[in-house]
């Protein structure tokens, strides 16, 4: 049951509120809380100089700033605490606040709690952003006023009073955002669950439990969309409270959406041909099947077909950059897990020269080697994980006698040059790192943009 936002306005007015993290989603949140009459203190590990103009703007607005080294030590004595998504609820600072009686929440939790529109929550280890974007495109194509947020789009909480009951709201939700969420999501989509973010979660079970929160608080009229090909997601129906629908790219019996003989079907109706979908790869077929099920009651088959045949994809996802000397270069920087890289490799019709490596999320790389070798002509490694990935391919050779040429470099420029030197006309070079970017870059977008810059300067 959605609550009246006036309740929140009355609750927050005059309260001593802490906001941890002065990032993209929290900047508009802080301004909004000030507008609602809260006494706001913003916390961040950066200094005022590093934050730049926004720190001056906040001071003018009357926001107290607690910045720099030891900033969380000063997180005490607040009535309400808005945490940043990556901050664990069992951190020392938040446990202290909880003991003091603080209400601990996040921008996304409060948004979903009070949002009047129909909320579609998309989560999963891979395919979240593309599926979120497809769902949003489908609803917009049908003529609905559609808002897109969460991990993508713009922070929505400060716009909550503009969102009407007939509007549609599509959210990409990470495991970090979901860990503490206890709110009802009308339509939940779980694309898949594979090992990911094990540097942040205690173990795989905690990661799975976080993902389950996307449907845990649903009621009987709500909808859960699950992947019937994934070992974990196919069993989620046992815990669902609402209606459950399934999709599969490999089988048809018992499936609500499926792929058969080159065509995509939803509830027995043909939507489109796989070859006519602009974004290639079987993983994108699965993304479309999930999206079709999520919006089936609101969107016509005609609109589904039109989006599938016109939507060109999201940046940094198997994105073609250019062809040089007969060699095609692709940017798949979004691929921050081995399973996402494997999905990207399957989109190509021939083995590729793969550029991989980066920040260590403590996930195994054996699947990349053992399941991906047929799609890899050579692999060029960089980043913190290069030795771990190299070891996985060495194990493949020792156990199966399968040799994949492995090269390595220190920088992205160096690995591009190595790949260029071993490539022949007709080859494909793709950046699909199977790792996060944080060892060398701010995020996967910056990594992808740098790769595009290097390739465009060849």
UniProtKB/Swiss-Prot annotation:
Pfam family, one: Mur_ligase_M
Record-level GO cellular component terms: cytoplasm
GO MF, any single term: UDP-N-acetylmuramoylalanine-D-glutamate ligase activity
Principal location listed in the UniProt entry: cytoplasm
GO terms under biological process: cell division; cell wall organization; peptidoglycan biosynthetic process; regulation of cell shape
First-level EC class: ligase
Subcellular location: Cytoplasm
Pathway it works in: Cell wall biogenesis; peptidoglycan biosynthesis
InterPro entries the record matches: Mur-like_cat_sf, Mur_ligase_C, Mur_ligase_C_dom_sf, Mur_ligase_cen, MurD
The entry's keywords: ATP-binding, Cell cycle, Cell division, Cell shape, Cell wall biogenesis/degradation, Cytoplasm, Ligase, Nucleotide-binding, Peptidoglycan synthesis
Catalytic activity: UDP-N-acetyl-alpha-D-muramoyl-L-alanine + D-glutamate + ATP = UDP-N-acetyl-alpha-D-muramoyl-L-alanyl-D-glutamate + ADP + phosphate + H(+)
Signal peptide residue numbers: none
UniProt-annotated binding residues for ATP: 124-130
Top-level division of the source organism's lineage: Bacteria
PANTHER family xrefs: UDP-N-ACETYLMURAMOYLALANINE--D-GLUTAMATE LIGASE
Family, as annotated: Belongs to the MurCDEF family.
Role this protein plays: Cell wall formation. Catalyzes the addition of glutamate to the nucleotide precursor UDP-N-acetylmuramoyl-L-alanine (UMA).
Protein name in the entry: UDP-N-acetylmuramoylalanine--D-glutamate ligase
UniProt source species: Clostridium perfringens (strain 13 / Type A)
